[in-house]
Amino acid sequence: MAFEVDNDSFPGAIEGLKALKMRGTGVSMPNKQLACEYVDELTPAAKLVGAINTIVNDDGYLRGYNTDGTGHIRAIKESGFDIKGKTMVLLGAGGASTAIGAQGAIEGLKEIKLFNRRDEFFDKALAFAQRVNENTDCVVTDTDLADQQAFAEALASADILTNGTKVGMKPLENESLVNDISLLHPGLLVTECVYNPHMTKLLQQAQQAGCKTIDGYGMLLWQGAEQFTLWTGKDFPLEYVKQVMGFGA
């Protein structure tokens, strides 16, 4: 069931969850950051991000998780790519992007080069980078996307390029943050958070450049799988859900 809950109503919603002995809930905007204040425990990744999208209720003890990051990193791993010791160029500094960065840092990325526009997220991105640098072995830098020379240099030495922004999603389906396809090299893994459209302009560019790609369905699938297991304690019906989603089609 879905409930529309604003910030003012959120504390009451949490009390209702406990009173009804609900096993848990998903959390969407605008409550992802606020929700951190109403759980008893946060995962290491959720602490780094400062936002959660999943709450699990164990007899009134609430744990907060962020499955966006685990979902995306799981999609990368399922493709056969080992992220340990690798460098990721990460586009954007919103919720999805920072969740991916946090989980990647925890699971062994050597370096994350954040690129985002100097907008309302920029200062938050700097703070996020500082938290990751202080709490993991991963080195995170944050650079204005307007610095195209720095962007080009980062891509030249990167192993992974991940788009954590809405660029590529309808109505921006004809746009990409990569202005020059020559910046993409065959050794680069290019991954998306956007799943509508299935094949974004960035993924089209990447395939033309000979890169391996992972579309946004991977993150959608695996973050949902993580939530399912957290709430039920059971294995996710992977093949059935893949069929329903048209995954891999």
UniProtKB/Swiss-Prot annotation:
The keyword Lyase does not apply. Substrate binds at K32, D68. Keywords: Amino-acid biosynthesis, Aromatic amino acid biosynthesis, NAD, NADP, Oxidoreductase. GO terms for biological process: amino acid biosynthetic process; aromatic amino acid family biosynthetic process; chorismate biosynthetic process; shikimate metabolic process. It catalyses: L-quinate + NAD(+) = 3-dehydroquinate + NADH + H(+); L-quinate + NADP(+) = 3-dehydroquinate + NADPH + H(+); shikimate + NADP(+) = 3-dehydroshikimate + NADPH + H(+); shikimate + NAD(+) = 3-dehydroshikimate + NADH + H(+). One of its GO terms (molecular function) is shikimate 3-dehydrogenase (NAD+) activity. Pathway: Metabolic intermediate biosynthesis; chorismate biosynthesis; chorismate from D-erythrose 4-phosphate and phosphoenolpyruvate: step 4/7. It is an enzyme of class 1 (oxidoreductase). Its EC number is 1.1.1.282. Pfam families: SDH_C (PF18317), Shikimate_dh_N (PF08501). Disulfide bonds: none annotated. NAD(+) binds at A93, G94, G95, A96, N116, R117, R118, D119, K166, C193, V194, Y195, N196, G216. Belongs to the shikimate dehydrogenase family. The actual biological function of YdiB remains unclear, nor is it known whether 3-dehydroshikimate or quinate represents the natural substrate. Catalyzes the reversible NAD-dependent reduction of both 3-dehydroshikimate (DHSA) and 3-dehydroquinate to yield shikimate (SA) and quinate, respectively. It can use both NAD or NADP for catalysis, however it has higher catalytic efficiency with NAD. Homodimer. This is Quinate/shikimate dehydrogenase. The gene is ydiB.
